[in-house]
Each structure stands twice: as structure tokens, then as C-alpha cells.
Amino acid sequence: MKAAVEKLDKNQVLLEVEVEAPRVQKAIDQAYRRLVKQVNIPGFRKGKAPRFILEQYIGKEPIYNEAAEIVIPPAYEEAVAEHQLEPIDRPEVEIVKVEDGEPLVFKARVEVKPEVQLGPYTGLEVERQEVEVTEADIDAYLKRLQERYAELEVIEDEPAAAGDIVTIDFKGTVDGQPYPGMEGNNYPLELGSGTFITGFEEQLVGARVNEERTVNVTFPSDYHEKDLAGKEAVFQVTVRGIKRKKLAPLDDEFAKDVSECETLADLRQDIRRRLEESQKQRVEAAVRQAVVEKAVAAATVELPEVMVERRIDARIRELERNLQAQKMTLEEFLKNTDKTIGDLEKEFRPGAERDVKTELVLEAIAKAENIQPSQEEIDAEIERMARIFRQDPDTVRKNLGDLSVLKYDIMIKKTIDFLVEHSKPVPPREQGAAGETAETAEATPA
């Protein structure tokens, strides 16, 4: 097989491929055997007519076209591999010549990944925040543990206070008319949690069991349901019950109840370790993101529209899956937000362009630095996945197929590792603590 490549405009190339005659003839014979089984020819059993009879009945062109469909796909893949091309779209194929005893010639026009002009990507200055956990962070963490493991005490003769959990019946109206979804019975609501519209929960503070209250609220102007945005609503609320959190004292018994620690001191030390580890992970994630952003910003590349459009489509599909988890269709979301698919595509475009450029730049750096996953790294990742999914590694390997996606993911991770290793840490600017506090850390100690 012979293949020549010509570069065209806008990341397009033209491949001209010549497939050797014996290979073409074999495909023509195979095409005849396929077609003769599909055609009813008078006087012959199906599949038994000689080729010259089939040609008289349907002509040579269908046989040649079928042979081309057999030959061209693998020949195209071979030509792409030979010239180390990276197509990003389906090729436009033109058959130049196909006939008995002659080579098949075809042309394939296809868009390929663009060339990336890399800027500096080593020695990049990246801020690295210090990891620091204070006693106040640990105290706040413990407070959250107290809240989480608090006992609920039934309140009968006292008014509801902020932090209490009230059970309510409620029914709302807008412009004097009931509105779907604005009513409920025996609904548990923690006062001060921000679960309901701003102002709703505050108006229930001081209410007693079986007391009825009229609650007036105004929906935000940017509320997700356009029909309610900016509207005033009136709720008739009946408090059916009140429960108050009873916090356990912070002592050794509390530590034993909520963790595997024997003493409160041990629990505080465990919390410190967890918060420090969480902060380290946040700092490392921030460094990785920053170094990638700088490397990408320093590079120049013409973004292929087909890759951007695919990324936009992927974002819309992800949105649709998230909506389905909330029992909402994409059509309902668009109606509620007064948007169209075109609006979503416009919103998602900047992020899609950023993703595509990041992907292309990281691939170019990996190529420049010859970064590839080793067999040991591939095996280790399969072992890790097997532990997560509680499956045999061979089963995971089989389910992954050709491992191309796994290899790509490892390559990208190693490329980012390379950027971080070759970056230059600099002190952070004065902008407050960067580490995670007890308010945002994971709440359950070992």
C-alpha cells in the first residue's frame, strides 16, 4: 500500500492512498460472495449464481462499491498510522479508481489535531499556600460533631428557637392562588438552615406547637422558576411539633461514641491530622490547576470547531443527567429558566474552548517530553480500580477493553505531575488562609 499526505488549510489534510491489486481483487471476490446471497436471480438458487450472471443482473458498480467498503476503512487506518496523523472527525472519502486486476485508489480529506505552539512550561511560578490547622479549626470541627450526634428532645411548652427542628404543615399562594409544589404536611425543617426561601424560617422563630402563622416571603428575582421570580407569596403554616438538639458534653465518652479514639485529646489529634491532610490535598489541587492554567495560557493553538462542539454537547448531556437525578427533564429546565438549547451552547462555549485547549496543550507537552504510562503504572491503576469496585483485576482489564482511555488518563496525570515537579513555588499573596477549615472539612473522624 502507498499513501501520500498533503496539508491543507485549517488543520485539514488530504490522503491519497493506493491499495495493491491482489488485496483489491480479494475484496472484490469477497464482495461478490456477499452480494450474491442477497439477490434473487431467476433460474438460480440464492447465493449460487456465477459472478458474470450477477454482474449482468446488477452491474459491476455495486460489486466494486462493496469491495471499496471492505478495503478502504483498514487502508485508511493504516495510512493514518503511517503518517502519524490524529484525525478528529470522519474523513470525506472519494474513490478515484477501482476495478478488477488494478490497484484501488482513493482520497480522504480529514481534519486532524492542530499543531500546538508551546510557550514556557517549566519553571513556572506557582503560589503554594502553607498548611496550618488552628485550635479554633479543631473546636469548630468538634462543634459540628456535637451537632451531628446530638439527641433530639421534644419541646412542648416552649417557643421554637433558631436551630430547633419544627414539623410543619404549610400551604402557599401567589397572587391569592395556590401554586403547585408550595404545600406539604409533616415537613421537618431546621430553623436557620436556609432550606426555605429567605425570611420563611425566621418568621417561625417563637412559634409554639399547634400555633398557626402567616408567613410572607418574596422569591428572589433570579429564582429558577421564572413564574415565581420576584413574586410575593403567602404561606399558612401550622407548627405540629418542635424538637431541640441536646448536645453531648465534650469529654472522653463523647470521643468514644463518635470515633475509634479513647480520649478527647486523641480525638483532637485525629481531627488535626485529618484537617491537615485535607488542606494538603486542597493545596496540591490548587497548585496543579494553577500550573496547568499557566502552561495553557503560554501556548498558542487554533481550536478545531468540531472538538469544541463535541465538548459543548458533552456538557449539555452532563446537565441532562444531573437534571434527571433531580426528577427534571432538560425541556422542563429550559422552560423554567426561559432558555433555549442555543443559549446553553453559548453559555458552555467558553468552558468548552478552555477544556479543548487544555487537552491539546497537555498532549503536546506529553509528546515533547515523551511522557507515556509504563506497564507497571497501568497494572497499578487496574489494581486500584479492582479494589474500589471489588472485582478481580482481570475482570476490570477485560471491561476496560483496549485500555486506550486508561492509558490516556495516566499520561495526562503524569504530564501534570511533570509540570508541578518542574514549577517554582513562590510565597502566597496576602489573601487570608488558603487551607480548609473545620467548616468545609469532612465531618467524620475514624
From Swiss-Prot:
Tree of life domain: Bacteria
Pfam families given in the database record: FKBP_C (PF00254), Trigger_C (PF05698), Trigger_N (PF05697)
GO molecular function: peptidyl-prolyl cis-trans isomerase activity; protein folding chaperone; ribosome binding
Reactions mediated catalytically: [protein]-peptidylproline (omega=180) = [protein]-peptidylproline (omega=0)
GO biological process: 'de novo' cotranslational protein folding; cell division; chaperone-mediated protein folding; protein transport; protein unfolding
Subcellular location: Cytoplasm
Listed InterPro entries: PPIase_dom_sf, PPIase_FKBP_dom, Trig_fac, Trigger_fac_C, Trigger_fac_C_sf, Trigger_fac_ribosome-bd_bac, Trigger_fac_ribosome-bd_sf, Trigger_fact/SurA_dom_sf
Main location: cytoplasm
Region (Disordered): 423-446
Positions of the PPIase FKBP-type domain: 163-248
Skewed-composition ranges (Low complexity): 432-446
PANTHER family: TRIGGER FACTOR CHAPERONE AND PEPTIDYL-PROLYL CIS/TRANS ISOMERASE (PTHR30560), TRIGGER FACTOR-LIKE PROTEIN TIG, CHLOROPLASTIC (PTHR30560:SF3)
Protein family per UniProt: Belongs to the FKBP-type PPIase family. Tig subfamily.
Domain comment quoted from the record: Consists of 3 domains; the N-terminus binds the ribosome, the middle domain has PPIase activity, while the C-terminus has intrinsic chaperone activity on its own.
Protein known as: Trigger factor
Organism per entry: Moorella thermoacetica (strain ATCC 39073 / JCM 9320)
Gene name for this UniProt entry: tig
